[in-house]
A protein has these predicted regions:
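Secondary-structure transition motif
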Residues: 1-124
Length: 124
């Protein structure tokens, strides 16, 4: 079984999302779109998140830091990577392991970096 190991991070200049592998100090990400000459981007280390290897119902990759809805629930869940696994948090409390939820009902609606206003709604 082949697992895709992928990270994302937001560039310090421009705030663009870069996908690839981070350096050991999590200050840069190598974008591996061009394997002959990968580009290296300085990123905000707080925004670096690991791909969970799980896709939502729209075939969108789910990363640590993403926010999602679960079915018809109005609440938003946050994805965190802790203790070696991806966890779903609801209103700041652990709800469950991401891989145990029915992904056909998960829809990523944003992330904690681009959509901080959604965090306020989550925690109210």
């Amino acid at each position: 079984m082949e697992q895709e190991i992928l990270f994302r991070g937001k560039t310090k200049s421009g705030g663009k999302w870069i996908y690839g592998m981070p350096t050991y100090d999590f200050q840069y990400i190598f974008n591996d779109d061009n394997l002959d000459s990968p580009d290296c981007y300085e990123v905000d280390s707080k925004t670096i998140g690991l791909f969970s290897t799980i896709y939502d119902k729209n075939k969108k990759r789910i990363f640590a830091g993403d926010l999602f809805k679960l079915g018809s629930e109005k609440d938003l869940f946050e994805v965190r990577f802790e203790h070696g696994c991806f966890l779903a948090y609801l209103k700041g409390k652990q709800f469950g392991i991401l891989g145990e939820l029915h992904t056909c009902f998960i829809e990523v609606v944003g992330n904690i970096y681009d959509n901080p206003e959604l965090l306020e709604v989550m925690n109210s």
